[in-house]
Amino acid sequence: MKRQTIVTLDLEGVLVPEIWIAFADKTGIAELRRTTRDEPDYDVLMRGRLALLDAHGLKLPDIQDVIGTLAPLEGAKAFLGELRALTQVIILSDTFEEFAQPLMRQLGWPTLFCHHLDVDAAGRITDYRLRQPNQKQQAVAAFQSLNYQVLAAGDSFNDTTMLAQADTGFLFHAPEGIRTQFPQFRAFDRYEDLLAAFKACL
């Protein structure tokens, strides 16, 4: 009997712009342009980001103001809508609840598994809290334990364990360095091509 399917998608770079790159462009702090496409160690990346925010006196509302100006990538909402009409879709992201709400609203409120920030009364981000380490791979494994076939797509280093755990994983909008390092995953740049690849697995 054919198993039911869940699709898991990364958020930033796949459906919406990279939040930290947008914030870096707004503030002029070039070091904030580093993302999980550049740094495979997420703790190193986040500790560096928090140190930069402190050094420049920037707080959560400053980031939220920039997020409020962002929109999903062109074609993302239609792609997600068509995919959700075919199968269950869950967004697995290393973003934070405090960042995601405006973008989730624009995408039609898909289910999102992500992390949490510690923020003091003045709005300073004091720390970040992972819901669990390697949560993307862990979520896929949990869905598989419920007898789901899992299809996945992402663009960054932090997606590759999710893609490897999934029954089928694809790269989407991934930079050339990641495509070269992980040639086992088929890579796409257009939503219609990714949708066709998913449909072929359903």
Where are these regions (language model features)?
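Alpha-helical substrate-recognition element adjacent to the catalytic core
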Residues: 2-116, 120-121
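Acidic, Mg2+-coordinating phosphoryl-transfer loop and its flanking beta/alpha structural elements
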Residues: 89-94, 148-189
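Short, well-ordered alpha-helical microsegments
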Residues: 97-101, 159-160, 195
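Substrate-recognition "cap/lid" segment bordering the active-site pocket of phosphatases
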Residues: 98-150, 181
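Short acidic-hydrophobic, aromatic-tinged amphipathic segments that line or gate anion-handling sites
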Residues: 113, 185-194
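Short amphipathic alpha-helix with an adjacent loop that forms part of the alpha/beta core around
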Residues: 195-202
